[in-house]
From Swiss-Prot:
One of its GO terms (molecular function) is Ser(Gly)-tRNA(Ala) hydrolase activity. GO terms for biological process: D-amino acid catabolic process. Pfam families: Tyr_Deacylase. Keywords: Cytoplasm, Hydrolase, RNA-binding, tRNA-binding. It comes from Streptococcus pyogenes serotype M49 (strain NZ131). The gene is dtd. It catalyses: glycyl-tRNA(Ala) + H2O = tRNA(Ala) + glycine + H(+); a D-aminoacyl-tRNA + H2O = a tRNA + a D-alpha-amino acid + H(+). This is D-aminoacyl-tRNA deacylase.
Length: 147
């Protein structure tokens, strides 16, 4: 899995002008699923995300997790994280998981996250508009195959 984590003051995702999910303080996750991803990748990503200390404590140090601040997650599927830009000027997305597998793993990932923190989400495969107010900004890339 490839994920982009953005610390936000608020974020929302809309489809056809209607809000599908919205959060206040927390994390916006852009979630890409690869063809070789499995339950181990999901568990690793969930563990890292819910425990990563990227929120400020009383002294202004990044020392608190999303659980510590009682934040929420907005999860948005994003197959374009697997873009291959090596040849030409048009990205290829053949490195992303096929839709059936990606949807299954994305849904399972969100269910596992929801065991720890509230999770809002976009609609898998939909054309979405994402709005956010970055906090920091703090943006972190997490690749489950690089640990």
């Amino acid at each position: 899995m490839k994920l982009v984590l953005q610390r936000v003051k608020e974020a929302s995702v809309s489809i056809d002008g209607k809000i599908a999910g919205a959060i206040n303080q927390g994390l916006l996750l852009l979630v890409g699923v690869g063809p070789d991803d499995n339950a181990e990748d999901l568990a690793y990503a969930v563990r890292k995300i819910v425990n990563m200390r990227i929120f400020s404590d009383a002294d202004g140090k990044m020392n608190q997790s999303i659980q510590d601040i009682k934040g929420s997650i907005l999860s948005v599927s994003q197959f374009t994280l697997y873009a291959d830009t090596k040849k030409g000027n048009r990205p290829a997305f053949t490195g992303a998981a096929k839709p059936d597998l990606a949807r299954q793993l994305y849904d399972s990932f969100n269910e596992q996250l929801a065991e720890f923190v509230p999770v809002e989400r976009g609609v898998f495969g939909a054309d979405m508009q994402v709005s956010l107010i970055n906090d920091g900004p703090v943006t972190i890339i997490l690749d489950t195959k690089c640990h």
